[in-house]
Structure formats: structure tokens, C-alpha cells
């Protein structure tokens, strides 16, 4: 899909800041879903891109040689790299909008979902959701400690049920 290609291209070119400056946005809404749930890909020339679904669905990933997948779970290397990248990201974003106009959406992966018939099921691998949510919360906490002036929408207080009929597709963070 063209939208997936644009997403992957943006990740490689690291030009999101230019795009955001051009559109003169008033607020920026962020979350750490991809950061907390998808691996980081380290190329043989020490570049990093997110191992998101859009990239994994392309043929590009199969063409790479000597790449490493750095996963979050029990991996301090990932968290250190993430904190370094977060600082660079926030330095750039804060030139586009003030910190008070940045909104963090605190989310989490659901432990249950509704199938296409509306029947509720527990996730097959709750341990994975627990690990991802722990890491996601760790990222949120670090972010809020480092940037206390940002605003927050907290969606972690309720236990959401994922809905596999969600318009954006099946995911444990697409709630009903």
C-alpha cells in the first residue's frame, strides 16, 4: 500500500520534523505503543528503524542482511537507546510546539478482546501483554519525569477490551 510505503520511507529518512513544521501543527499527540510493542531493527551500518508492521509487510526486510532485532522485554540496551532517541526527538519536537502542547496518551495492551462475532475472549498470551504493559508504563514514567510540562490522556485506569472489528484493524490497543 502507498500509505505503508510512506510510513516506512518516513522512518528511514527521519524527516517527520520537517513535515510537522510545514503543517504548522498546534498540538502533537504521542504514545509509545510501537516503542513498547515492536522491535527495533539495527542495520549492519548501525542505523535504527522501528520494526513496525508496515515494514514487516514489505519485501525490504527480507532483502537485508546482517540485521539485529532488539526487543524490549528484559532488555536494558533497548531502553537506553530509546531514552537517547527520545531526547533527540523531544529536542526537535519542542522547536515545533511548546511542551505544554504535547499530549501523551498513556495506553496499554488489553487482556481480553471481542472477536468478529462480538464474543469476549482472553488473550492467548497474557504474559506478553503483561510484559509489554510493564515496558510501556516504564516509558511513560520516564517521559513524564523528563518532560513534566506535557499534558496527559490516561487510558490505563480502565481495563479496555480490544475489538477486532475496529476500523483500523485487529490490535490489542484498538478498544471497543
Predicted feature locations:
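Acidic carboxylate-rich catalytic motifs and surrounding loops in phosphoryl-/glycosyl-chemistry enzymes
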Residues: 104-108, 148-166
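Substrate-gating cap/lid alpha-helix
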Residues: 112-154
Amino acid at each position: 500500500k502507498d500509505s505503508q510505503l510512506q510510513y516506512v520511507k518516513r522512518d528511514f529518512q527521519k524527516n517527520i520534523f520537517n513535515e510537522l513544521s510545514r503543517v504548522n501543527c498546534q498540538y502533537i499527540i504521542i504514545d509509545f505503543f510501537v516503542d513498547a510493542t515492536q522491535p527495533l531493527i539495527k542495520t549492519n551500518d548501525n542505523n535504527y528503524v522501528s520494526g513496525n508492521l508496515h515494514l514487516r509487510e514489505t519485501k525490504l526486510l527480507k532483502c537485508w542482511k546482517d540485521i539485529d532485532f532488539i526487543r524490549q522485554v528484559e532488555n536494558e540496551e533497548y531502553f537506553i537507546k530509546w531514552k537517547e532517541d527520545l531526547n533527540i526527538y523531544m529536542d526537535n519536537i519542542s522547536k515545533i510546539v511548546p511542551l505544554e502542547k504535547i499530549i501523551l496518551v498513556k495506553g496499554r495492551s488489553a487482556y481480553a478482546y471481542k472477536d468478529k462475532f462480538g464474543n469476549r475472549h482472553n488473550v492467548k498470551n497474557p504474559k506478553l501483554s503483561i510484559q509489554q504493559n510493564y515496558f510501556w508504563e516504564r516509558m511513560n514514567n520516564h517521559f513524564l519525569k523528563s518532560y513534566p510540562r506535557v499534558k496527559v490522556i490516561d487510558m490505563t485506569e480502565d481495563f479496555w477490551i480490544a475489538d477486532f472489528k475496529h476500523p483500523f484493524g485487529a490490535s490489542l490497543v484498538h478498544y471497543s
